[in-house]
Amino acid sequence: MKNKKTKILVLYAMFIAIEMLLVFIPFLGYIPIGPLRATTLHIPVIIAGIILGKKGGMIIGLVFGLSSLFYNTISPTVTSFVFSPFISGSILSAIVAIVPRVLIGFFAGVIFEQFCKHKWNQYAGIIISGLVGSLANTILVLAGIYFIFGQSYAQA
């Protein structure tokens, strides 16, 4: 029992370390494309959801969300007001920065668990979890921007 807890703790530490490396190594986690930043930070969150389950994916997703909030605060671009309440003055920015990222790990974990539970093809479960996690990030962030900051974002 003790070895399993240690293994889980080490996996959490590794995923958090990977997230932090992606955040702080230039052009690796955040890729500047004009005034926007594409991200690869959702990839470890999806993998954590698959390996550690929905709870683990949500925890690593929280790290992604908090790092997004932090990074957009210390290194702002034209659109950083959407992800940082310190720039926009609205706590709703924190919701856009954190909630979709937490849900990436949740969705990836739930879908993979369902594939394993029903004894379906595990490789298909990994692929579909990855696709759904990536789409969840994109759709939920864009929906948050549209519904909360639609007018302001259009002007930026």
For each feature predicted by the language model, list its residue ranges.
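Loop-helix junctions at membrane interfaces
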Residues: M1-A156
